[in-house]
Regions:
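Switch I (G2) and immediately adjacent beta-strands of P-loop GTPase domains
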Residues: 1-33, 47, 53-56, 60
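P-loop NTPase catalytic nucleotide-binding module
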Residues: 40-185
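Redox-cofactor binding/interface segments in oxidoreductases and associated redox assembly factors
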Residues: 36
């Protein structure tokens, strides 16, 4: 457990190996959000899909964390595509690796900068499109104005997460700290 910006966060770290499945599944009953960590070097593994499915069946918010973005010989763009193929178009990046994976660029709250692949602006647009689909009035305003404020997106974002309409993908490096601050935000 730790405090972050006056919010108490409890992390339950469970094993991802099939041999320890009996230790991992009971934790799903005690959490609001299932954060599924994918090692960028290994990509999608057999248990990754199962954990995503089990979390969905329990109605949990799901978050996919791609770690080790700074490792050698990783194709993060291809990994993101595989994640979307495996778990659906609702898997959208909240940030994208930048500076040869030494940092990340925010795609939702304050989109700016470049990324190592893809366009931050395109990623932002896809996220906003996905979130506004949850609220008809907000969608109408968005279609009229072409943009909505972060304040207008707050409640629909939470609803999209709760309803599984959005599964955020966050790129991080535990080794260098890239993306960790953004993940906590």
């Amino acid at each position: 457990s730790f405090d972050f910006q006056e919010i108490k966060i409890h992390l339950l770290d469970t094993p991802g190996y099939p041999d320890f499945l009996g230790h991992a599944l009971p934790a799903l009953a005690a959490v609001e959000t299932a954060a599924i960590v994918i090692n960028a070097q290994n990509g999608l593994e057999m248990m990754t899909g199962r954990f995503v499915q089990w979390a969905a069946k329990r109605g949990l918010d799901r978050l996919i964390i791609v770690n080790k973005i700074d490792a050698e010989n990783v194709d993060l763009e291809a990994l993101l595509e595989r994640i979307q193929q495996a778990f659906g178009r609702e898997c959208l990046p909240l940030n994208l690796p930048a500076g040869k994976a030494s940092k990340v660029s925010d795609c939702f709250f304050a989109p700016s900068g470049e990324s190592d692949f893809s366009s931050v602006e395109d990623a932002h647009r896809k996220l906003v499109d996905q979130v506004v689909e949850i609220d008809e009035k907000l969608m109408e305003r968005y279609l009229e104005k072409g943009e909505v404020t972060p304040e207008e997106l707050h409640e629909p974002l939470e609803r999209a997460l709760r309803e599984g309409h959005l599964i955020p993908v966050v790129f991080t490096s535990a080794k260098t700290g890239a993306g960790i601050g953004e993940l906590l935000e």
